[in-house]
């Protein structure tokens, strides 16, 4: 399952059955990267669909969305839905990258028409605060390139403007995705088998677990994030039981 030292190429190999080094783009991607998996190749979720399974992808995706010029205010195609998943609820990249929104079946959840969302990995949008210009807005110090747009008091990689109501709250992400998994399991066609890909967002940086997990270990935010990840898996297994 781990064909590479990083997650995107490993995930690419998992879904396509191909070594990531056969695709020069199978590497850590920006949040606005185009879909990495070609739509015209066999994939694991497509094979599951062909075998009669209902398929879903929930959680961290980071395999690209769209065609390289994403309009986040419309349905995003191509997407995980076009490479074998019947239902999807995802973050486009990682917790530390923009856009900091949930994308459900190709649509940004909670996005308001009068507050459109814009994303750039090249230049900031005029007047938008960053970790370097407005350090007073942060609850976490920037590090290792995380000094661009501030969301939820946390500095991110990349620049983002708008979509205020759609932006996630990091502390709630574990509960959010667990609830989406339960909703899928509850609402699925019980006459069919199912295949669920659940991409854990923890313990990826910035490691901001819910308050109930803060201090649950003696190993700081990373240890607490691991405990939160364990809780997520336990909740889903218990629900299945």
Predicted regions and their residues:
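Formylglycine-dependent sulfatase
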Residues: 1-241
């Amino acid at each position: 399952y781990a064909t590479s030292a990083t997650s995107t190429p490993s995930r690419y190999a998992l879904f396509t059955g191909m070594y990531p080094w056969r695709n020069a783009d199978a590497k850590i991607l920006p949040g606005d990267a185009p879909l990495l998996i070609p739509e015209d190749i066999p994939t694991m979720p497509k094979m599951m669909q062909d075998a009669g399974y209902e398929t879903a992808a929930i959680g961290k995706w980071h395999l690209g969305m769209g065609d390289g010029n994403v309009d986040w205010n419309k349905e995003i195609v191509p997407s995980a839905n076009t490479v074998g998943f019947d239902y999807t609820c995802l973050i486009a990249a990682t917790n530390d990258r923009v856009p900091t929104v949930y994308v459900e079946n190709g649509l940004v959840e909670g996005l308001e028409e009068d507050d459109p969302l814009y994303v750039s990995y090249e230049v900031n949008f005029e007047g938008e605060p960053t970790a370097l210009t407005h350090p007073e807005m942060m609850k976490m110090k920037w590090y290792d390139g995380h000094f661009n747009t501030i969301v939820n008091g946390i500095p991110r990689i990349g620049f983002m403007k708008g979509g205020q109501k759609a932006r996630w709250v990091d502390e709630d992400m574990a509960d959010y995705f667990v609830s989406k998994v339960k909703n899928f399991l509850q609402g699925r066609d019980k006459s069919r088998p199912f295949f669920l890909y659940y991409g854990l967002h923890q313990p990826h940086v910035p490691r901001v677990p819910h308050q109930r997990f803060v201090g649950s270990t003696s190993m700081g935010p990373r240890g607490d994030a691991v405990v939160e990840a364990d809780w997520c898996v336990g909740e889903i297994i218990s629900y299945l039981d």
